[in-house]
């Protein structure tokens, strides 16, 4: 082959490689607060392949300036680069196993998926649940309606139907939940679903309404409690008939809200003592003796971390109640509370996992903020804070919302990683989508957090490190500083001759992936 022909072939190969790289890029649209990536029926950006040989490493960068998981190969050096900041990872010292990331199959998510062409809905689910996308491992499923529904409904509104003879799934289940749960399973055959009620039917509550505050009528093992347990079991059974098995069940979403008279959404109040006894005497034994519930893990709390460790202590210090409990569910809305709440809870109950079951942005301002990098950074900070304090999983509040941040019957609008525009046959991927990807795409099921240290205090750089089952290592770094860049020398104690230099521009999220 002539030199000229060889150069021509190499040139074509380089051009093709460049075109492939560009084909994966974000189709940017700029708003006042930042950049979104626009997807339509023919195009949507993809996460670059890791594509590394043994011993190689790469960084994946997302920035306020517009990078979205931009891939750069990083070469190890035998000598320590000339930088003052040194970050060390040590995989010989491990902490909790990471169970994975998830999102919620809310009515609002299903309604928005349904509003788009089928091919686009499929694209969204592939980008969320396939291993080439966010690689989500969990799906949260509301039992009946919640604040992200278009209407208030339960599965049995027939007064005094204590045996739940008239229990019936609703159109929302058949149109907006089950079909998309099944589609997601196509991309992740090991997808785990966990269910949670916002309220019992109103006629089983002290206020005779699913909306607002109120508690479950009756006492343990009486007609009211048995009826409500039957209601939950029927839900699990009906979904099982549709091919959906549940990995977990939280006994109540935000139980402290149900005791607040200001609460407007569907809610039901539990104290820690009430939840302890409800698990021990009602739902726990019933699940164990049922076909649909015998393998379901019970999660307690499902509320903000400020309730810990006291709530967990109250439930789990009762040996009988604890025998039914697998996990402690936490929300992200009080993460200004000390992270010591999480670590103390783990120390008190090391055999019970802690799992993040709800996180969202925009719930206070009730809006969608197109291109907000601040909200992406909030997600990264929340995940790092959680994982550095023994949390094993993290769940987004909605898969997809509309331009207003809904639908929501109670106007409880919020932001989401994906925003649908059915009239344009488009959807936007918010920076929050990529923030989640910095963890979920790279951490494989069974990954463990490993020890890490920075040689000098720097609150502007948030970080954590992980070891995958295949031996690959993942370091996630977040430079919060809006002006100052940093350079880090990253050293793996298990390969003491290898040093990786990573540059952190201002307002940047970086994942370093080191192939085994």
From Swiss-Prot:
It is an enzyme of class 3 (hydrolase). GO terms for cellular component: membrane. It holds the Pfam family Glyco_hydro_30C. Residues 1-23 form the signal peptide. InterPro entries: GH30_C, Glyco_hydro_30, Glyco_hydro_30_TIM-barrel, Glycoside_hydrolase_SF. Pathway: Lipid metabolism; sphingolipid metabolism. GO terms for molecular function: glucosylceramidase activity. Belongs to the glycosyl hydrolase 30 family. Glucosylceramidase that catalyzes the hydrolysis of glucosylceramides into free ceramides and glucose. C.elegans contain specific sphingoid bases, which are unique or different in structure compared to the sphingoid bases found in other animals. Two examples of these distinctive compounds are: 15-methylhexadecasphinganine and 15-methylhexadecasphing-4-enine. This is Putative glucosylceramidase 2. It comes from Caenorhabditis elegans. The lineage of its organism: Eukaryota, Metazoa, Ecdysozoa, Nematoda, Chromadorea. The gene is gba-2.
């Amino acid at each position: 082959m002539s030199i000229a022909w060889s150069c021509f072939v190499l040139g074509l190969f380089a051009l093709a490689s460049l075109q492939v790289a560009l084909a994966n890029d974000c189709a940017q649209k700029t708003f006042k607060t930042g950049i979104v990536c626009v997807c339509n029926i023919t195009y949507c950006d993809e996460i670059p392949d890791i594509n590394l040989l043994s011993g190689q490493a790469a960084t994946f960068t997302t920035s306020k300036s517009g990078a979205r998981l931009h891939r750069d190969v990083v070469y190890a050096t035998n000598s320590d680069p000339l930088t003052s900041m040194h970050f060390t990872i040590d995989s010989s010292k491990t902490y909790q196993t990471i169970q994975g990331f998830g999102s919620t199959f809310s009515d609002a998510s299903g309604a928005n998926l349904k509003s788009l062409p089928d091919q686009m809905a499929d694209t969204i689910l592939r980008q969320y649940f396939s291993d080439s996308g966010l690689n989500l491992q969990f799906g949260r499923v509301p039992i009946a309606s919640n604040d992200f529904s278009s209407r208030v409904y339960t599965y049995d509104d027939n007064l005094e139907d204590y045996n739940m003879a008239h229990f019936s799934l609703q159109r929302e289940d058949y149109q907006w939940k089950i079909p998309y749960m099944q589609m997601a399973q196509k991309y992740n055959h090991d997808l785990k679903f966990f269910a949670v009620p916002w309220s019992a039917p109103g006629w089983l509550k002290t206020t005779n309404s699913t909306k607002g505050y109120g508690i479950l009528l009756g006492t343990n093992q009486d007609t009211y409690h048995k009826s409500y347990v039957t209601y939950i079991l029927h839900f699990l059974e009906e979904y099982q008939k549709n091919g959906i098995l549940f990995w977990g069940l939280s006994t109540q979403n935000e139980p402290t809200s149900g005791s607040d008279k200001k609460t407007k959404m569907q809610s039901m109040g539990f104290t820690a003592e009430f939840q302890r006894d409800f698990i021990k005497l009602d739902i726990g034994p019933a699940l164990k003796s049922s076909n649909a519930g015998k393998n379901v893990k019970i999660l307690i709390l499902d509320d903000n971390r400020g309730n810990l460790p006291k709530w967990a202590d109250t439930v789990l210090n009762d040996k009988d109640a604890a025998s039914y409990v697998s996990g402690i569910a936490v929300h992200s809305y009080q993460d200004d509370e000390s992270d010591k709440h999480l670590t103390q809870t783990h120390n008190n109950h090391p055999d019970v996992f802690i799992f993040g079951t709800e996180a969202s942005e925009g719930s206070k301002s009730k809006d969608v903020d197109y291109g907000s990098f601040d909200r992406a950074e909030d997600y990264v900070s929340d995940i790092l804070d959680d994982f550095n304090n023994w949390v094993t999983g993290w769940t987004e509040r909605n898969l997809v919302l509309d331009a207003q941040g809904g639908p929501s019957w109670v106007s409880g609008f919020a932001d989401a990683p994906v925003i649908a525009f059915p009239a344009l046959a488009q959807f936007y991927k918010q920076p929050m989508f990529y923030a989640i990807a910095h963890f979920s795409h790279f951490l494989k099921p069974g990954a463990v957090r490993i020890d890490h240290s920075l040689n000098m205090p720097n609150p502007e750089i948030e970080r954590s490190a992980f070891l995958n089952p295949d031996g690959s290592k993942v370091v996630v770094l977040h430079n919060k500083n809006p002006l100052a860049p940093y350079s880090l020398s990253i050293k793996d104690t298990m390969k003491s001759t290898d040093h990786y230099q990573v540059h952190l521009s201002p307002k940047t999220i970086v994942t370093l992936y080191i192939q085994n």
